[in-house]
């Protein structure tokens, strides 16, 4: 049995066994487990499993195990359950001889009560953030891959212009790399439409069509469509992914309503056609112009804050981003990043936000130096620090800095210092979203690599110094426990 399989089985036992699991899924670093009864979960046992870097209780129990490991653990859990990742796990409650119906009814009432409380706790903002995350998290590997390939093409192009390399085959290679990159970025609206449809309960293919509609691929020459509000020609992609997400949400409402009123015999033919016609017209003439205004204004405001605020804005963004990640609010920036890339070719917000993770790495290095006797902490750092350098910060947040308290605050200060440097230098952007830390370096636009490196090193140093001086307690340094 592999280490990941053992970890999966220990997690299953800690959450109350397979009989208490409704479904299992995962993101880049977390196994997300939906349980039937929260009271059967042994939180302390779960947190102390070797390999578990943190536990977050939300609508699902989120167990942080780190990148790479998470896929193997989640897949083994799904394999043991006999269903695919994300699918509900069947449980047999029909055995009347073994079943106490009175207890089952009481348990069901209790579960419904807890579910109602959870609904009240999870407000509209949380639902919006979760939807944004569910739409874009599956696309992150594609963003990273396409962005890196585009970055290589840009480097080769710069080397050709400078005269360091030459040849027709280099030109062809650059062209091929750009074609691969555009396979993601040029059709992002379609991918977004498909994922949004899955999230909102519409047919994924119809969501993709609505996303593709915003590209206006059927327009050529003089057959232009006009913006009904300004009288100017509509531009392909106007409204960006904000418009696509809103349009697909409307699509889900229209499609569900049509399924209720269209006879079953013609539902599969009539419903898709009518839904596409209604929402397609609304998208072209209403949603695209309005969403275009919203996205343009939003990007202008963010760019203005960064350019005018400079050092101050950089510090605030860099210092506040870790708390936003902790609360799950960082996903709200994903559409902003993408719109900035669509409009100007780069997001100038991401490199500043990336300094938060760098500040945390600096804090972790200080803990490694200061807490030599705390072997539990150092063992956790061994697994969390390498991926922290690569921009994956959740193992450090939930496994190290947040449980300890003080290092989380000093890490935020380090991130703010790095953000101030990036903001002060200015015009440091990223051509794609996804990674941060050292991994973001190939995606930096306009050859501003040295500026980004300066920000990283400053954030590392700031997080290290602040944590070394103010971020530890005597208990942290002298005990073998992860915490005060």
Swiss-Prot record:
Documented EC number(s): 2.7.1.-
Record bears the keyword Cell membrane: yes
Domain of life where this protein originates: Bacteria
Cited Pfam families: PTS_EIIB (PF00367), PTS_EIIC (PF02378)
Subcellular location, record wording: Cell membrane
Active site: 27 (phosphocysteine intermediate)
Transmembrane regions: 135-155, 160-180, 200-220, 234-254, 274-294, 305-325, 349-369, 384-404, 408-428, 450-470
Keywords from the named record: Cell membrane, Kinase, Membrane, Phosphotransferase system, Sugar transport, Transferase, Transmembrane, Transmembrane helix, Transport
Pathway terms, separated by semicolons: Cell wall biogenesis; peptidoglycan recycling
Topology versus the membrane: Multi-pass membrane protein
Taxonomic lineage of the native organism: Bacteria, Bacillati, Bacillota, Bacilli, Bacillales
UniProt catalytic activity: N-acetyl-beta-D-muramate-(1->4)-N-acetyl-D-glucosamine(out) + N(pros)-phospho-L-histidyl-[protein] = 6-phospho-N-acetyl-beta-D-muramate-(1->4)-N-acetyl-D-glucosamine(in) + L-histidyl-[protein]
Residues in PTS EIIB type-1 domain copies: 5-87
InterPro entries documented for this protein: Glu_permease_IIB (IPR036878), PTrfase_EIIB_Cys (IPR018113), PTS_EIIC (IPR003352), PTS_EIIC_1 (IPR013013), PTS_IIB_1 (IPR001996), PTS_Sugar-Specific_Components (IPR050558)
Domain notes: The EIIB domain is phosphorylated by phospho-EIIA on a cysteinyl or histidyl residue, depending on the transported sugar. Then, it transfers the phosphoryl group to the sugar substrate concomitantly with the sugar uptake processed by the EIIC domain. The EIIC domain forms the PTS system translocation channel and contains the specific substrate-binding site.
Protein name, UniProt field: PTS system MurNAc-GlcNAc-specific EIIBC component
Residue span(s) of domain PTS EIIC type-1: 130-484
Gene3D superfamilies: Glucose permease domain IIB
Alphabetized CDD domains for the sequence: PTS_IIB_glc (cd00212)
Keyword Lyase: no
Cellular component terms per the entry's GO annotation: plasma membrane
GO biological process: peptidoglycan turnover; phosphoenolpyruvate-dependent sugar phosphotransferase system
GO molecular function, one term: protein-phosphocysteine-N-acetylmuramate phosphotransferase system transporter activity
Protein task: The phosphoenolpyruvate-dependent sugar phosphotransferase system (sugar PTS), a major carbohydrate active transport system, catalyzes the phosphorylation of incoming sugar substrates concomitantly with their translocation across the cell membrane. This system is involved in the uptake and phosphorylation of MurNAc-GlcNAc, the principle peptidoglycan turnover product of S.aureus, yielding cytoplasmic MurNAc 6P-GlcNAc.
């Amino acid at each position: 049995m592999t280490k990941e399989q053992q970890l999966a089985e220990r997690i299953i036992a800690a959450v109350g066994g397979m009989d208490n699991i409704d479904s299992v899924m995962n993101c880049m670093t977390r196994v997300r487990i939906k349980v039937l009864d929260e009271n059967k979960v042994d939180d302390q046992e779960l947190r102390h499993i070797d390999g578990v870097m943190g536990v977050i209780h939300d609508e699902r129990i989120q167990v942080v195990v780190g990148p790479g490991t998470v896929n193997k653990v989640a897949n083994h859990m799904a394999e043991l359950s006999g269903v695919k990742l994300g699918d509900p796990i069947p449980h047999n409650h029909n055995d009347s001889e073994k079943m106490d119906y009175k207890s089952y009814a009481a348990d069901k009432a209790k579960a419904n009560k807890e579910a109602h409380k959870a609904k009240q706790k999870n407000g509209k903002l949380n639902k919006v953030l979760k939807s944004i995350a569910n739409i874009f998290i599956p696309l992150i590997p594609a963003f990273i891959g396409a962005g890196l390939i585009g970055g290589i093409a840009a480097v080769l192009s710069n080397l050709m212009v400078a005269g360091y390399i030459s040849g027709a085959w280099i030109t062809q290679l650059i062209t091929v790399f750009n074609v691969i990159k555009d396979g993601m970025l040029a059709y992002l609206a379609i991918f977004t439409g498909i994922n949004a449809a899955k999230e909102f309960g519409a047919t994924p293919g119809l969501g993709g069509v609505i996303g593709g509609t915003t590209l206006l691929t059927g327009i050529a020459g003089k057959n232009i469509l006009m913006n009904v509000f300004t009288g100017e020609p509509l531009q392909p992609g106007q409204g960006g992914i904000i418009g696509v997400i809103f349009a697909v949400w409307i699509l889900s409402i229209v499609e569900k309503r049509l399924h209720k009123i269209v006879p079953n015999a013609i539902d599969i033919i009539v419903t898709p056609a009518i839904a596409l016609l209604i929402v397609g017209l609304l998208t072209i003439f209403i949603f695209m112009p309005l969403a275009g205004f919203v996205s343009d204004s939003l990007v202008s405001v963010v760019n203005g804050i960064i350019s005018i605020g400079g050092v101050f804005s950089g510090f605030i963004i860099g210092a506040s981003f870790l708390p936003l990640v902790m609360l799950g609010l960082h996903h709200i920036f994903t559409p902003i990043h993408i719109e900035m890339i669509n409009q100007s070719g780069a997001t100038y917000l991401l490199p500043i936000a990336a300094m938060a993770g760098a500040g945390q790495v600096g804090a972790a290095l200080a803990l490694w130096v200061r807490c030599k006797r705390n072997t539990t902490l150092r063992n956790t750092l061994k697994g969390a620090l390498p991926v922290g350098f690569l921009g994956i910060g959740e193992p450090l947040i939930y496994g190290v800095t947040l449980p300890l308290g003080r290092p989380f605050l000093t890490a935020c200060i380090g991130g703010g210092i790095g953000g101030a440097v990036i903001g002060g230098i200015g015009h440091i952007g990223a051509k794609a979203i996804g990674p941060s830390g050292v991994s973001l370096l190939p995606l930096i636009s306009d050859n501003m690599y040295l500026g980004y490196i300066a920000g990283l090193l400053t954030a590392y140093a700031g997080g290290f110094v602040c944590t070394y001086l103010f971020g530890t307690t005597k208990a942290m340094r002298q005990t073998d426990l992860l915490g005060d």
